[in-house]
C-alpha cells in the first residue's frame, strides 16, 4: 500500500514537470507571450472574468479588432502618437498570480479566467499549463478560439477547460478563405471533435460581418451546423464593430473594412429570429 502511494505521488510529480534543455522544469515556469490582460470583464464567459490575450494567430480576418495580436513577435504600435510595445513574455506562475488577484470577484460572480488572442492555440503548451494552473486553484476556465489548430493541440487543453467559446464564421470554405486567409474545414472538423468528446461545454459564436456572412441564409447555415453538434445549446451572434480600426494605422497597415457599417440592431434581431426558425438553439446577440 505504501509503495503504491509513493508511486502515485511520484507519478503526479513527473506529470508536473517538463523537459527544457535537458533539465526537468516545473510546468509553472513555462513561458508564453501575451499582449494584454483585461480585468473585470463581464463578457467571454460567465461572471466577472480576467481575459488573458495571447500573441499569435494563423488567420488574417479582414475585420480583426486586435491586429496587434496576429504576429507572434513583439511589435511597436503607435498609440496616441507614442510608441507602445505590444507583447511581453511571462511564465505561467507570473500570469496565474496576476489572475488570482481577482479571486474574490470570481467567487462572488461565478467568474474566472478566459484565454483569448489572437488564437490562444498558437501557444498550446502555454495555454494548457495556464488553464491547468487555474483549475488547480479552483478558478473557472474558458477559451475564445476558432479551433484552427491540429487536434492534438486542442485535445491537450480539454481536461482543464470548463467552457469553449468557438468561432464559426462561415460554412462556405471558399468565402471563408477569401475573408480570413484560410479555409474552414479544419475548424468545423474540430468543432465536431470537441462536441463529441463531451469534455467541456461548447458554445458557438458567430461574428456577424457585413459583406461576409450577414445574410439570413448564411446565418441559418451556421445555425444548422451548430445544431448538429452534440451537447451544443447556445449560439451567440456578435455584431461587427470598428473599435480596432485605429490600431491598423498605428501598425502602418491598411484597414480592409473601410466604409463598412456595423449591422443595425434591427438586422441583428432579424438574424436572431432566423436562427430560431431553423433550430432549437438558444440564440443571443452579444456574448
Enumerate the predicted regions with their spans.
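N-terminal [4Fe-4S]-dependent radical SAM core
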Residues: 1-91, 101-109
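Short alpha-helix boundary/capping motifs
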Residues: 76, 80, 162-163, 204, ...
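Short alpha-helical interface patches
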Residues: 81-84, 93-100, 265-276
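Auxiliary Fe-S-binding modules of radical SAM enzymes
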Residues: 1-43, 210-287
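Glycine-centered flexibility sites
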Residues: 45-47, 56, 63-64, 87, ...
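Short glycine-enriched, charge-decorated loop/helix-capping segments at active-site entrances
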Residues: 81-85, 177-183, 252-260
